[in-house]
């Protein structure tokens, strides 16, 4: 009898975990003694492989894109902007929905920027939690 409930419990646990990540103010990162978890570390790598060209080193902004450390949108808005792009006036950001180096890793990039915005992670390449 217990075996028939296991798949249901597993689905509920995964759904609950995803819902917790999407809850307003939920922390997607885990920093231990200044070291980043795998998701946050991967977000650092992905951010610095492309996003930093406009948003500056460590997400601090540049003349091309705003700081994402000083003013990080909520997760839903971040996903929407990264996928679809945004623009107003002379400032335009293309969408990355079809970019295989960005689209699958939007939440990882957000986790890194959230850790930076919260002051939980300093500048530069983070060490990884073992």
Language-model features: where?
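Positively charged n-region of N-terminal signal peptides that target proteins for export
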Residues: 1-5
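The canonical Cys-X-X-Cys-His
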Residues: 48-57, 82, 93, 109-113
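Gly/Gly-Pro-rich "capping" loops immediately C-terminal to redox-active cysteine motifs
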Residues: 33, 37-40, 56-84, 92-95
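Flexible coil segments in periplasmic/lumen-exposed cytochrome c-class electron-transfer proteins
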Residues: 21-33, 37, 45, 94-130
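N-terminal signal peptide c-region/cleavage motif recognized by signal peptidases
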Residues: 15-17
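Classic N-terminal secretory signal peptides
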Residues: 8-11
């Amino acid at each position: 009898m217990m075996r028939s409930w296991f798949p249901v419990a597993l689905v509920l646990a995964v759904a609950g975990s995803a819902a917790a990540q999407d809850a307003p103010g939920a922390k997607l990162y885990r920093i231990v003694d200044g070291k980043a978890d795998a998701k946050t570390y991967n977000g650092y790598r992905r951010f610095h492989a492309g996003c930093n060209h406009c948003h500056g080193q460590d997400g601090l902004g540049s003349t091309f894109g705003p700081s994402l450390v000083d003013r990080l949108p909520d997760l839903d808005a971040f996903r929407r902007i990264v996928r679809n792009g945004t623009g107003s006036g002379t400032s335009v950001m293309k969408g990355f929905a079809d970019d295989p180096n960005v689209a699958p890793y939007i939440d990882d990039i957000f986790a890194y920027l959230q850790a930076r915005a919260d002051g939980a992670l300093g500048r530069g390449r983070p060490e990884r939690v073992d």
